[in-house]
Amino acid sequence: GADCVVKQEDAEWDERAVRIYHNAKPGENYCPAGEDFSAGDLLAEAGTPVDSYLLAAVTAAGVRNLTVYKRLKAAVITTGDELQNTETPLQPGKIYDANGIWLCTRLREMDCEVVRYQTAGDDQSKIADEIREAWKEADLILTTGGVSVGEKDLLPGVIENLTGNVLFHGIQVKPGMPTMLSMVKGTPVLSLSGN
């Protein structure tokens, strides 16, 4: 029949009596069942990243098993002889590889693990080698540049030589019309325009 709880530090007791040194109020220091959540409450939406708070909540609720998905592992391969990293002063006729840096950063912001980031220039065999290396560890490969119809747009030929299956090549959006999606050895390769 109690309606409150008195903290131990606010009382003294022995075998015969308890002495309380302040006026206790109804509901004081009392946590009703279901205070954190009730039966049937949604603890997390599908797709919520699992962190220490979520694990504590589901443990408190008695949840023993969760269906989870691993973090997506992505590889980024940029193409173009004009690309240069930012570690050296910009050379004439070159540009810094801003697309590669942006893609890697954006993927990490979306909780993906970037397992590989390489620049392959305009070299068909190097691009193919980079894709071969990437599919060993990545769930998704993103490429930039070399996907249109110019002399140095090598990606369509590289994908064909790797016996890739092109799912589409070209979308109705500007910029980015030559975007291509293909499957190579079971790994999706999303090829984006370099511009």
Predicted feature residues:
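Short, glycine/charged-enriched hinge/interface segments at domain edges or termini
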Residues: 1-116
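Short glycine/threonine-rich loop/turn motifs
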Residues: 94, 100, 111-194
